Amino acid sequence: MSKEKFKRSKPHINVGTIGHVDHGKTTLTSAITTVLSKKYGGAACAFDQIDNAPEEKARGITINTSHVEYDTSIRHYAHVDCPGHADYIKNMITGAAQMDGAILVVAATDGPMPQTREHILLGRQVGVPYIVVFLNKCDMVDDEELLELVEMEVRDLLTQYDFPGDSTPIVRGSALKALEGDPQWEQKILDLSNYLDTYIPEPKRSIDQPFLLPIEDVFSISGRGTVVTGRIERGIIKVGEEVEIVGIKSTVKTICTGVEMFRKLLDEGRAGENVGVLLRGTKRDDIERGQVLAKPGTITPHIKFESEVYVLSKEEGGRHTPFFKGYRPQFYFRTTDVTGSVELPEDMEMVMPGDNVKMVITLIHPIAMSDGLRFAIREGGKTVGAGIVVKVLQ
Protein backbone atom coordinates (compact mmCIF):
# COMPACT_ATOMS: atom_id res chain seq x y z
CA MET A 1 0.00 0.00 0.00
CA SER A 2 1.68 3.21 -1.12
CA LYS A 3 1.44 6.26 1.11
CA GLU A 4 -1.17 8.79 0.14
CA LYS A 5 0.36 11.92 -1.31
CA PHE A 6 -0.20 14.92 0.95
CA LYS A 7 -2.30 17.46 -0.93
CA ARG A 8 -1.12 21.01 -0.44
CA SER A 9 -4.11 22.76 -1.95
CA LYS A 10 -5.30 24.29 1.34
CA PRO A 11 -3.44 26.16 4.06
CA HIS A 12 -2.37 23.86 6.90
CA ILE A 13 -3.16 24.90 10.50
CA ASN A 14 -2.17 23.18 13.76
CA VAL A 15 -4.70 23.19 16.61
CA GLY A 16 -5.41 21.20 19.76
CA THR A 17 -7.93 20.72 22.55
CA ILE A 18 -7.07 21.94 26.06
CA GLY A 19 -9.09 22.06 29.29
CA HIS A 20 -9.95 20.27 32.54
CA VAL A 21 -10.09 16.48 32.84
CA ASP A 22 -13.51 14.98 31.90
CA HIS A 23 -14.82 18.20 30.38
CA GLY A 24 -15.05 16.44 27.01
CA LYS A 25 -11.87 17.25 25.04
CA THR A 26 -11.60 13.83 23.42
CA THR A 27 -15.35 13.57 22.76
CA LEU A 28 -15.19 16.98 21.07
CA THR A 29 -12.18 15.92 18.99
CA SER A 30 -14.17 12.88 17.84
CA ALA A 31 -17.27 14.99 17.15
CA ILE A 32 -15.32 17.48 15.02
CA THR A 33 -13.85 14.72 12.82
CA THR A 34 -17.27 13.04 12.54
CA VAL A 35 -19.33 16.12 11.67
CA LEU A 36 -16.75 17.61 9.29
CA SER A 37 -16.17 14.27 7.52
CA LYS A 38 -19.88 14.21 6.65
CA LYS A 39 -19.71 17.67 5.16
CA TYR A 40 -16.21 17.92 3.65
CA GLY A 41 -14.99 14.32 3.45
CA GLY A 42 -12.07 12.88 5.41
CA ALA A 43 -12.03 10.28 8.16
CA ALA A 44 -14.21 10.24 11.27
CA CYS A 45 -12.30 9.15 14.39
CA ALA A 46 -14.11 7.30 17.17
CA PHE A 47 -13.55 8.25 20.82
CA ASP A 48 -11.53 5.13 21.68
CA GLN A 49 -9.32 5.57 18.59
CA ILE A 50 -8.32 8.98 19.94
CA ASP A 51 -8.22 7.98 23.60
CA ASN A 52 -5.68 5.19 23.02
CA ALA A 53 -3.02 7.75 22.28
CA PRO A 54 0.29 6.37 21.06
CA GLU A 55 3.51 7.27 22.88
CA GLU A 56 5.88 9.74 21.28
CA LYS A 57 9.24 11.06 22.28
CA ALA A 58 10.02 14.77 22.20
CA ARG A 59 13.31 16.07 23.61
CA GLY A 60 13.84 12.76 25.39
CA ILE A 61 10.42 12.84 27.06
CA THR A 62 7.67 10.31 26.44
CA ILE A 63 4.29 11.89 25.76
CA ASN A 64 0.96 10.32 24.87
CA THR A 65 -0.67 12.30 22.09
CA SER A 66 -3.32 11.63 19.48
CA HIS A 67 -3.15 13.35 16.12
CA VAL A 68 -6.25 13.63 13.95
CA GLU A 69 -6.87 15.65 10.82
CA TYR A 70 -9.91 17.26 9.28
CA ASP A 71 -10.92 19.73 6.59
CA THR A 72 -13.16 22.75 6.38
CA SER A 73 -14.04 24.38 3.07
CA ILE A 74 -10.93 26.58 3.21
CA ARG A 75 -8.36 24.83 5.43
CA HIS A 76 -6.74 21.57 6.45
CA TYR A 77 -6.33 21.10 10.23
CA ALA A 78 -3.97 18.88 12.18
CA HIS A 79 -5.41 18.50 15.68
CA VAL A 80 -3.73 17.12 18.79
CA ASP A 81 -5.50 15.71 21.84
CA CYS A 82 -3.83 14.30 24.97
CA PRO A 83 -5.37 11.74 27.31
CA GLY A 84 -3.78 12.87 30.59
CA HIS A 85 -3.19 16.21 32.29
CA ALA A 86 0.57 15.56 32.60
CA ASP A 87 0.70 14.85 28.86
CA TYR A 88 -0.72 18.32 28.17
CA ILE A 89 1.88 20.01 30.32
CA LYS A 90 4.70 18.04 28.70
CA ASN A 91 3.28 18.65 25.24
CA MET A 92 2.99 22.39 25.68
CA ILE A 93 6.40 22.84 27.29
CA THR A 94 8.34 20.63 24.85
CA GLY A 95 6.44 22.01 21.87
CA ALA A 96 5.98 18.45 20.63
CA ALA A 97 2.78 19.67 19.04
CA GLN A 98 3.07 23.34 18.22
CA MET A 99 -0.35 24.98 18.17
CA ASP A 100 -1.38 27.91 15.96
CA GLY A 101 -4.50 28.06 18.13
CA ALA A 102 -6.23 26.03 20.82
CA ILE A 103 -9.81 24.97 21.51
CA LEU A 104 -10.49 25.40 25.22
CA VAL A 105 -13.16 22.96 26.34
CA VAL A 106 -15.18 23.94 29.44
CA ALA A 107 -18.11 21.87 30.72
CA ALA A 108 -21.12 24.13 31.27
CA THR A 109 -22.08 21.83 34.17
CA ASP A 110 -18.85 22.64 36.08
CA GLY A 111 -17.56 25.93 34.77
CA PRO A 112 -13.82 26.68 34.86
CA MET A 113 -11.81 24.25 37.03
CA PRO A 114 -8.16 24.20 38.23
CA GLN A 115 -6.78 22.61 35.05
CA THR A 116 -8.77 25.07 32.93
CA ARG A 117 -6.77 27.83 34.59
CA GLU A 118 -3.50 25.92 34.35
CA HIS A 119 -3.90 25.24 30.63
CA ILE A 120 -4.73 28.90 29.91
CA LEU A 121 -1.68 30.03 31.92
CA LEU A 122 0.55 27.51 30.12
CA GLY A 123 -0.91 28.62 26.81
CA ARG A 124 0.14 32.17 27.65
CA GLN A 125 3.62 31.09 28.82
CA VAL A 126 4.43 28.89 25.83
CA GLY A 127 2.97 31.22 23.24
CA VAL A 128 -0.29 29.63 22.08
CA PRO A 129 -1.45 32.71 20.16
CA TYR A 130 -5.24 32.19 19.92
CA ILE A 131 -7.90 30.42 21.97
CA VAL A 132 -11.46 29.59 20.88
CA VAL A 133 -13.85 28.30 23.57
CA PHE A 134 -16.24 25.36 23.30
CA LEU A 135 -18.75 25.36 26.17
CA ASN A 136 -19.58 21.65 26.32
CA LYS A 137 -22.48 19.68 27.85
CA CYS A 138 -24.92 22.55 27.26
CA ASP A 139 -27.66 19.96 26.65
CA MET A 140 -27.51 19.27 30.41
CA VAL A 141 -28.04 22.89 31.49
CA ASP A 142 -31.54 24.36 31.10
CA ASP A 143 -30.82 27.60 32.89
CA GLU A 144 -29.82 30.37 30.44
CA GLU A 145 -28.54 32.53 33.32
CA LEU A 146 -26.20 29.77 34.46
CA LEU A 147 -24.75 29.49 30.94
CA GLU A 148 -24.20 33.24 30.87
CA LEU A 149 -22.48 33.08 34.24
CA VAL A 150 -20.11 30.31 33.11
CA GLU A 151 -19.35 32.25 29.93
CA MET A 152 -18.52 35.32 31.99
CA GLU A 153 -16.20 33.31 34.25
CA VAL A 154 -14.36 31.90 31.23
CA ARG A 155 -13.98 35.37 29.70
CA ASP A 156 -12.62 36.75 33.00
CA LEU A 157 -10.13 33.91 33.26
CA LEU A 158 -8.87 34.48 29.71
CA THR A 159 -8.51 38.22 30.34
CA GLN A 160 -6.59 37.51 33.54
CA TYR A 161 -3.93 35.73 31.45
CA ASP A 162 -3.76 38.41 28.74
CA PHE A 163 -6.00 36.74 26.18
CA PRO A 164 -8.76 38.98 24.75
CA GLY A 165 -11.53 37.53 26.94
CA ASP A 166 -14.19 39.98 25.77
CA SER A 167 -13.81 39.18 22.08
CA THR A 168 -12.96 35.47 22.28
CA PRO A 169 -15.48 33.34 20.36
CA ILE A 170 -17.49 31.00 22.62
CA VAL A 171 -19.63 28.23 21.13
CA ARG A 172 -22.30 26.57 23.27
CA GLY A 173 -22.57 22.94 22.30
CA SER A 174 -22.74 19.29 23.21
CA ALA A 175 -19.97 17.11 21.78
CA LEU A 176 -21.80 13.91 22.74
CA LYS A 177 -25.11 14.94 21.12
CA ALA A 178 -23.25 16.05 17.98
CA LEU A 179 -21.47 12.69 17.90
CA GLU A 180 -24.85 10.96 18.14
CA GLY A 181 -25.96 12.87 15.03
CA ASP A 182 -28.43 15.37 16.51
CA PRO A 183 -28.64 18.11 13.79
CA GLN A 184 -29.12 20.97 16.28
CA TRP A 185 -25.83 20.09 18.03
CA GLU A 186 -24.01 19.13 14.81
CA GLN A 187 -24.57 22.73 13.72
CA LYS A 188 -22.64 23.91 16.82
CA ILE A 189 -19.62 21.90 15.66
CA LEU A 190 -19.87 23.62 12.27
CA ASP A 191 -20.07 26.97 14.11
CA LEU A 192 -16.89 26.03 15.97
CA SER A 193 -15.08 25.08 12.75
CA ASN A 194 -16.16 28.39 11.27
CA TYR A 195 -14.53 30.24 14.19
CA LEU A 196 -11.34 28.22 13.71
CA ASP A 197 -11.34 29.37 10.07
CA THR A 198 -11.98 33.04 10.85
CA TYR A 199 -10.49 33.71 14.30
CA ILE A 200 -7.16 31.88 14.00
CA PRO A 201 -5.04 33.63 11.36
CA GLU A 202 -2.81 31.69 9.02
CA PRO A 203 0.62 31.43 10.69
CA LYS A 204 3.70 32.91 9.08
CA ARG A 205 5.45 29.99 7.41
CA SER A 206 8.97 29.26 8.60
CA ILE A 207 10.33 30.06 5.14
CA ASP A 208 9.03 33.65 5.42
CA GLN A 209 10.80 34.26 8.74
CA PRO A 210 14.35 35.62 9.09
CA PHE A 211 17.11 33.11 8.28
CA LEU A 212 18.48 30.97 11.11
CA LEU A 213 20.69 27.87 11.02
CA PRO A 214 21.85 26.12 14.22
CA ILE A 215 25.46 25.06 13.57
CA GLU A 216 26.02 21.33 13.99
CA ASP A 217 29.51 20.97 12.55
CA VAL A 218 32.39 23.04 11.17
CA PHE A 219 34.90 21.98 8.51
CA SER A 220 37.76 23.64 6.82
CA ILE A 221 38.13 22.93 3.10
CA SER A 222 41.56 23.82 1.78
CA GLY A 223 41.43 26.48 -0.89
CA ARG A 224 37.74 27.20 -0.24
CA GLY A 225 37.49 28.23 3.39
CA THR A 226 35.25 27.26 6.26
CA VAL A 227 31.97 25.38 5.91
CA VAL A 228 29.32 25.09 8.61
CA THR A 229 26.61 22.45 8.39
CA GLY A 230 23.15 22.10 9.90
CA ARG A 231 19.44 22.14 9.18
CA ILE A 232 17.98 25.53 8.32
CA GLU A 233 15.40 26.27 11.02
CA ARG A 234 13.72 29.16 9.24
CA GLY A 235 14.09 31.53 6.32
CA ILE A 236 16.28 31.42 3.23
CA ILE A 237 20.02 31.97 2.78
CA LYS A 238 21.26 33.17 -0.60
CA VAL A 239 24.83 33.17 -1.88
CA GLY A 240 26.37 36.62 -1.37
CA GLU A 241 24.25 37.54 1.66
CA GLU A 242 25.69 38.83 4.90
CA VAL A 243 25.15 36.64 7.99
CA GLU A 244 26.01 36.82 11.68
CA ILE A 245 27.53 34.07 13.81
CA VAL A 246 25.79 34.37 17.19
CA GLY A 247 26.26 32.75 20.60
CA ILE A 248 29.01 31.51 22.95
CA LYS A 249 31.53 34.16 21.73
CA SER A 250 31.13 37.74 20.50
CA THR A 251 28.90 38.08 17.46
CA VAL A 252 30.77 38.35 14.15
CA LYS A 253 29.59 39.19 10.62
CA THR A 254 30.62 37.31 7.52
CA ILE A 255 29.42 36.62 3.96
CA CYS A 256 27.90 33.40 2.65
CA THR A 257 29.95 32.51 -0.43
CA GLY A 258 28.30 29.17 -1.19
CA VAL A 259 25.48 26.82 -0.24
CA GLU A 260 25.60 23.11 -0.92
CA MET A 261 23.29 20.16 -0.35
CA PHE A 262 24.16 16.52 -1.12
CA ARG A 263 27.45 17.79 -2.63
CA LYS A 264 25.58 19.96 -5.13
CA LEU A 265 26.02 23.72 -5.25
CA LEU A 266 22.87 25.79 -4.83
CA ASP A 267 21.97 29.46 -5.16
CA GLU A 268 20.07 29.33 -1.88
CA GLY A 269 19.17 27.12 1.06
CA ARG A 270 15.62 27.01 2.47
CA ALA A 271 13.93 26.23 5.79
CA GLY A 272 13.96 22.50 6.50
CA GLU A 273 16.99 21.69 4.33
CA ASN A 274 20.24 20.19 5.60
CA VAL A 275 22.98 22.29 4.05
CA GLY A 276 26.62 23.27 4.16
CA VAL A 277 27.25 27.02 4.11
CA LEU A 278 30.62 28.33 2.99
CA LEU A 279 31.75 31.45 4.87
CA ARG A 280 34.19 34.08 3.64
CA GLY A 281 37.34 34.80 5.64
CA THR A 282 36.25 32.93 8.75
CA LYS A 283 38.68 30.64 10.56
CA ARG A 284 37.69 27.11 11.52
CA ASP A 285 38.61 27.85 15.15
CA ASP A 286 36.36 30.92 15.36
CA ILE A 287 33.19 28.85 15.03
CA GLU A 288 31.80 26.00 17.10
CA ARG A 289 28.78 23.76 17.37
CA GLY A 290 26.05 25.48 19.39
CA GLN A 291 26.39 28.83 17.68
CA VAL A 292 23.85 29.89 15.06
CA LEU A 293 24.14 31.50 11.65
CA ALA A 294 21.46 34.18 11.31
CA LYS A 295 20.27 37.15 9.32
CA PRO A 296 22.05 40.18 10.86
CA GLY A 297 20.18 41.88 13.69
CA THR A 298 17.47 39.22 14.06
CA ILE A 299 18.72 37.30 17.11
CA THR A 300 20.95 38.20 20.05
CA PRO A 301 22.97 36.20 22.60
CA HIS A 302 21.72 36.02 26.21
CA ILE A 303 22.67 34.34 29.48
CA LYS A 304 19.71 34.97 31.79
CA PHE A 305 16.03 34.22 31.24
CA GLU A 306 12.73 33.26 32.86
CA SER A 307 11.49 29.83 31.90
CA GLU A 308 8.67 27.36 32.39
CA VAL A 309 10.05 23.87 33.04
CA TYR A 310 8.69 20.34 33.32
CA VAL A 311 10.84 18.02 35.44
CA LEU A 312 10.70 14.35 34.49
CA SER A 313 9.37 11.92 37.08
CA LYS A 314 11.44 8.95 38.22
CA GLU A 315 9.18 6.64 36.14
CA GLU A 316 9.97 8.67 33.03
CA GLY A 317 13.69 8.15 33.55
CA GLY A 318 14.21 11.45 35.35
CA ARG A 319 15.79 12.23 38.71
CA HIS A 320 14.91 10.13 41.74
CA THR A 321 15.38 13.03 44.16
CA PRO A 322 14.31 16.68 44.29
CA PHE A 323 16.65 19.56 43.47
CA PHE A 324 17.12 22.87 45.27
CA LYS A 325 18.09 26.43 44.38
CA GLY A 326 21.63 26.62 43.03
CA TYR A 327 21.09 23.37 41.07
CA ARG A 328 23.58 23.36 38.14
CA PRO A 329 22.67 21.00 35.30
CA GLN A 330 23.34 21.39 31.56
CA PHE A 331 20.82 23.17 29.36
CA TYR A 332 20.64 21.77 25.85
CA PHE A 333 19.80 24.47 23.28
CA ARG A 334 19.41 23.39 19.63
CA THR A 335 22.72 21.58 19.19
CA THR A 336 24.72 21.98 22.39
CA ASP A 337 24.82 21.75 26.20
CA VAL A 338 25.60 24.82 28.33
CA THR A 339 25.96 24.71 32.10
CA GLY A 340 23.68 27.03 34.05
CA SER A 341 22.32 27.66 37.52
CA VAL A 342 18.73 27.77 38.70
CA GLU A 343 16.81 30.31 40.82
CA LEU A 344 13.48 29.07 42.16
CA PRO A 345 10.43 31.19 43.07
CA GLU A 346 10.57 32.75 46.59
CA ASP A 347 8.03 30.39 48.13
CA MET A 348 9.61 27.24 46.75
CA GLU A 349 12.16 25.23 48.70
CA MET A 350 12.67 22.43 46.21
CA VAL A 351 11.42 20.91 42.97
CA MET A 352 10.17 17.33 42.91
CA PRO A 353 10.45 15.01 39.90
CA GLY A 354 7.14 15.28 37.95
CA ASP A 355 6.59 18.99 38.82
CA ASN A 356 6.23 21.87 36.43
CA VAL A 357 7.74 25.10 37.68
CA LYS A 358 8.69 28.63 36.70
CA MET A 359 12.41 29.34 37.20
CA VAL A 360 15.11 31.84 36.32
CA ILE A 361 18.17 30.34 34.66
CA THR A 362 21.64 31.88 34.29
CA LEU A 363 24.01 30.26 31.77
CA ILE A 364 27.82 30.35 31.83
CA HIS A 365 28.00 31.19 28.06
CA PRO A 366 25.58 33.31 26.07
CA ILE A 367 23.28 31.47 23.64
CA ALA A 368 21.38 32.95 20.68
CA MET A 369 17.83 33.06 21.98
CA SER A 370 14.47 34.78 21.93
CA ASP A 371 11.23 34.17 23.81
CA GLY A 372 9.67 30.83 22.90
CA LEU A 373 12.93 28.89 22.40
CA ARG A 374 12.72 25.31 23.72
CA PHE A 375 15.49 23.49 25.60
CA ALA A 376 16.17 20.26 27.47
CA ILE A 377 17.71 19.95 30.92
CA ARG A 378 20.36 17.25 31.12
CA GLU A 379 22.68 15.69 33.66
CA GLY A 380 25.60 13.88 32.08
CA GLY A 381 23.80 13.48 28.76
CA LYS A 382 20.60 12.15 30.36
CA THR A 383 17.44 14.25 29.92
CA VAL A 384 15.87 15.18 33.26
CA GLY A 385 13.55 17.98 32.15
CA ALA A 386 12.29 20.22 29.36
CA GLY A 387 11.64 23.93 29.25
CA ILE A 388 10.80 27.00 27.25
CA VAL A 389 12.23 30.52 27.41
CA VAL A 390 9.32 32.69 28.58
CA LYS A 391 11.21 35.98 28.90
CA VAL A 392 14.81 36.92 28.12
CA LEU A 393 16.29 38.97 30.98
CA GLN A 394 19.90 39.74 29.98
Swiss-Prot record:
Keywords, in A-Z order: Cytoplasm, Elongation factor, GTP-binding, Hydrolase, Magnesium, Metal-binding, Nucleotide-binding, Protein biosynthesis
Name by which UniProt lists this protein: Elongation factor Tu
Residues covered by region (G5): 174-176
Function recorded in the entry: GTP hydrolase that promotes the GTP-dependent binding of aminoacyl-tRNA to the A-site of ribosomes during protein biosynthesis.
Subunit structure: Monomer.
Species in which this protein is naturally found: Buchnera aphidicola subsp. Baizongia pistaciae (strain Bp)
Span list, region G3: 81-84
Enzyme Commission identifier(s): 3.6.5.3
Region G4: start-end pairs: 136-139
Localization per record: Cytoplasm
A Pfam family of this chain: GTP_EFTU
Superkingdom, taxonomy of origin: Bacteria
NCBIfam families reported for this sequence: EF-Tu, PRK00049.1, PRK12735.1, PRK12736.1, small_GTP
One of the record's GO cellular component terms: cytosol
GO terms of molecular function: GTP binding; GTPase activity; guanosine tetraphosphate binding; translation elongation factor activity
Region entry G1, spans: 19-26
